């Protein structure tokens, strides 16, 4: 099966500081992949490259077997086709919530894709019920709590039914109840009810990863330190300590 994404020798730097350093990685379709690693290991950079928001200085990325390049996004039809298949929710959802109400936020994507008005109304109504947004539908997104903003951002992407969802730290800065709400939402949307969907998310929360992921990639200094079934990777405590994900870092090899 063609993977969702394949990266070969990918390099990327911010102001001369390497973020990804010759990264080789295959991300399969139909899996729930968690990206783990210390701050600065390259997780957020990787997600931005997978979404076509940035492009590598060297190396190659393919999406669904097709090269993911700047040139692809100059072709309107190709760009729209990619955006229909891939959705991205930022760590800070405020950067993608800009409509006057939650209802308008949910309708924005379908409007951009020129869905018929009847289809938009029906799908937005279903999303409001599906994601428990009824009491929030008429409110401005910027006045919502952190957990509510995250839920609206997720709903505004999932309403388009993307094949792949990219999430950057989905529960960062949320309280325990909001964290549990987001985890439950992800379990529902990417569980047995939707077996073909692909989730790729970064996190420092090992409890969330154990609950959601079936595949884990650990990044270290812009390279893959480990990848495999979630239970196997999460059992490698020395590796997780080295990645600052468990207390007791001692510098030893996994």
From Swiss-Prot:
SUPFAM superfamilies this protein is in? Answer: P-loop containing nucleoside triphosphate hydrolases (SSF52540)
Q: Does the keyword Transport apply?
A: yes
The protein, known as: Nickel import ATP-binding protein NikO
InterPro entries recorded for this chain?
Answer: AAA+_ATPase, ABC_transporter-like_ATP-bd, ABC_transporter-like_CS, ABC_transpr_CbiO/EcfA_su, ECF_ABC_transporter_ATP-bd, P-loop_NTPase
Source organism phylogeny: Bacteria, Pseudomonadati, Pseudomonadota, Alphaproteobacteria, Rhodobacterales
* Gene Ontology MF terms: ATP binding; ATP hydrolysis activity; ATPase-coupled transmembrane transporter activity
Q: Where in the cell is it found?
A: Cell inner membrane
What role is this protein assigned? Part of the energy-coupling factor (ECF) transporter complex NikMNQO involved in nickel import. The complex confers nickel uptake upon expression in E.coli. Shows very low activity with cobalt. Presumably responsible for energy coupling to the transport system.
Q: Which family does it belong to?
A: Belongs to the ABC transporter superfamily.
Q: Which residues form the ABC transporter domain?
A: 5-246
Q: Which GO terms describe its biological process?
A: nickel cation transport
EC assignment:
7.2.2.11
Residues where ATP binds: 37-44
Keywords assigned by UniProt, alphabetized: ATP-binding, Cell inner membrane, Cell membrane, Ion transport, Membrane, Nickel, Nickel transport, Nucleotide-binding, Translocase, Transport
Known catalysed reaction(s)? Ni(2+)(out) + ATP + H2O = Ni(2+)(in) + ADP + phosphate + H(+)
**What Pfam family does this protein match (any one)?**
ABC_tran
Q: Subunit structure, briefly? A: Forms an energy-coupling factor (ECF) transporter complex composed of an ATP-binding protein (A component, NikO), a transmembrane protein (T component, NikQ) and a fused possible substrate-capture protein (S component, NikMN) of unknown stoichimetry.
How does it sit in the bilayer? Peripheral membrane protein
The terms describing its cellular component in GO are: ATP-binding cassette (ABC) transporter complex
